[in-house]
């Protein structure tokens, strides 16, 4: 039996998009891995399933990592939804409702309020999340933020000088993080201007991470490295972050439709 899929990306963070509004899709870890495999499948960082919404939500969104794990939130994926549908939408996710609107940049998303207490990240035990008293070699004293999924943010002198593939993997799987962790490194490049990289939980090094950019903005504000609307440069391009009067994090950036294809479910069983 064949099915249609769509490829999209947000700053190079690429997705398989499956529209399940008319025909529901029962995803599982093995199938998500098979579809996401860049050598034997379609290939992506994450798999997005758009379904019907309930109550306040126009649509629902499931997000599956390339390793087969399901995750609560993905900022770049969220920006893709209004672009895919061609309209503003309220999206139901495992992290709650998200307001995603079309904008001149591509899409603008209200990512909600950050969660900052140790048990909301979550961490394995209580500690200050502003400057955590831990270190992994030269990466020291990160700030922890939950933006629908868990992040740590390290401030460094040069994001390109860090052996990030090795250290990111090490930190992701540390016992301090019972649900594993997304790892971000950031440097200040100017007034309200940052440069960052992300090791994404379940996906590895990615060209962009929307929730990572949100978490990095929150960490930078908490550390008084930025004061207002901030431009953040990632390997795949630029996002603009701000905080509204209600303490919600607002993310603006591009989302790009690439192509539509067809495949046979039997190829991935």
Curated annotation (Swiss-Prot):
The record marks 151, 200 as: Could be important to modulate the pK values of the two catalytic cysteine residues. It catalyses: (2S,6S)-2,6-diaminopimelate = meso-2,6-diaminopimelate. It is an enzyme of class 5 (isomerase). The active site is at 74 (proton donor), 209 (proton acceptor). One of its GO terms (molecular function) is diaminopimelate epimerase activity. It comes from the Bacteria. Keywords: Amino-acid biosynthesis, Cytoplasm, Isomerase, Lysine biosynthesis. Catalyzes the stereoinversion of LL-2,6-diaminopimelate (L,L-DAP) to meso-diaminopimelate (meso-DAP), a precursor of L-lysine and an essential component of the bacterial peptidoglycan. Homodimer. Belongs to the diaminopimelate epimerase family. This is Diaminopimelate epimerase. It comes from Zymomonas mobilis subsp. mobilis (strain ATCC 31821 / ZM4 / CP4).
């Amino acid at each position: 039996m064949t099915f249609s899929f769509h490829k999209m990306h947000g700053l190079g963070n690429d997705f398989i998009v499956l529209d399940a509004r008319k025909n529901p899709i029962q995803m599982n870890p093995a199938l998500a891995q098979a579809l996401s495999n860049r050598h034997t499948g379609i290939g992506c960082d994450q798999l997005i399933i758009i379904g019907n919404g309930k109550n306040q939500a126009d649509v629902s969104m499931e997000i599956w990592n390339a390793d087969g794990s399901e995750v609560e939130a993905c900022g770049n994926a969220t920006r893709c939804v209004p672009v895919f549908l061609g309209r503003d939408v309220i999206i139901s996710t495992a992290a709650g409702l998200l307001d995603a609107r079309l904008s001149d940049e591509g899409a603008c998303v209200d990512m909600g309020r950050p969660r900052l207490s140790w048990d909301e990240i979550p961490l394995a035990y209580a500690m200050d999340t502003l400057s955590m008293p831990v270190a992994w070699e030269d990466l020291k004293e990160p700030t922890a933020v939950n933006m629908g999924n868990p992040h740590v943010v390290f401030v460094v002198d040069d994001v390109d000088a860090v052996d990030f593939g090795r250290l990111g993997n090490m930190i992701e799987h540390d016992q301090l993080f019972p649900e594993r962790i997304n790892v971000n490194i950031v440097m200040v490049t100017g007034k309200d201007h940052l440069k960052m990289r992300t090791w994404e939980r379940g996906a590895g090094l990615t060209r962009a991470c929307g929730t990572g950019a949100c978490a990095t903005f929150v960490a930078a504000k908490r550390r008084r490295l930025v004061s207002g609307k901030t431009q953040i440069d990632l390997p795949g391009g630029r996002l603009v972050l701000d905080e509204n009067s209600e303490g919600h994090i607002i993310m603006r950036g591009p989302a790009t439709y690439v192509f539509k294809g067809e495949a046979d479910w039997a190829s991935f069983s």
